């Protein structure tokens, strides 16, 4: 059975672990536990063929900046996550996360993933953002950044309601299986 390795990166507390747990177990975790490193595996059927989708969770906290890249070799696709209600996590996609993955895995495809879309219309969240003269990140802003950074696509979801959740992983699988241009090997390699 062919395995697809999918690594999830992004700032701490943007919902990376919730995204994976909600997708793999259909349950939303109730408390926040910062991740050091975890992985999950699910079997998916693509065109009648079974594939193992290996999902690798990473810690977004800076303390793990040297440890995190150890999970990057052999990656087929990255999910670069930010919370749509955390403008700083959106900024860090461009400032930190895409530079980090492209430094280690230049040709590996990645999706830009907006998380926590259920909070986009929540009053307390909007008030908190307004106090700092901020607004939630829009779908259009996500699509624009994805294009600018050459992501395969921009997708967004809520791990809580599961809206858009399956689509995130369907798109990740498609990105990993897209036939590469003949001159490029797309799997991440460390030299």
Curated annotation (Swiss-Prot):
Task: Give the matching InterPro entries.
Answer: Cdc42, P-loop_NTPase, Small_GTP-bd, Small_GTPase, Small_GTPase_Rho
- Tell me the organism's taxonomic lineage: Eukaryota, Metazoa, Ecdysozoa, Arthropoda, Hexapoda
Membrane topology listed for this record: Lipid-anchor
Q: Where in the cell is it found?
A: Cell junction, Adherens junction; Cell membrane
Briefly state the protein's biological role. Regulates mbt kinase activity and is also required to recruit mbt to adherens junctions. Together with mbt and Frl, regulates photoreceptor cell morphogenesis. Together with Frl, has a role in the neuronal development of mushroom bodies.
Q: Where is the lipid attached (S-geranylgeranyl cysteine)?
A: 188
Record-stated family:
Belongs to the small GTPase superfamily. Rho family. CDC42 subfamily.
Report motif location: Effector region: 32-40
Q: Which organism is it from?
A: Drosophila melanogaster
What keyword terms does UniProt attach to this protein?
Answer: Cell junction, Cell membrane, Developmental protein, GTP-binding, Hydrolase, Lipoprotein, Membrane, Methylation, Nucleotide-binding, Prenylation
Specify the protein name.
Answer: Cdc42 homolog
